[in-house]
């Protein structure tokens, strides 16, 4: 049986850190920024770590 392919859409959106955690960017940033507060826009600039409860599901999608 051939290897499972990684989900290409997900590969482009996340990075795996050296310790195996999953890093992702904040959502709701691409447009309609005038309706958001300065604080919301500033805090969404930085990437954040994915929640632990999502690790198992996402690691299965990006296995190599």
From Swiss-Prot:
Gene3D superfamilies cross-referenced by the UniProt entry: 4.10.410.60
Name by which UniProt lists this protein: Large ribosomal subunit protein bL35
Keyword Disulfide bond: no
Domain of life, per lineage: Bacteria
InterPro entries: Ribosomal_bL35 (IPR001706), Ribosomal_bL35-like (IPR021137), Ribosomal_bL35_CS (IPR018265), Ribosomal_bL35_sf (IPR037229)
GO cellular component: cytosolic large ribosomal subunit
Keywords: Ribonucleoprotein, Ribosomal protein
GO biological process: translation
GO terms, molecular function: structural constituent of ribosome
Cystine bridges: none
Family, as annotated: Belongs to the bacterial ribosomal protein bL35 family.
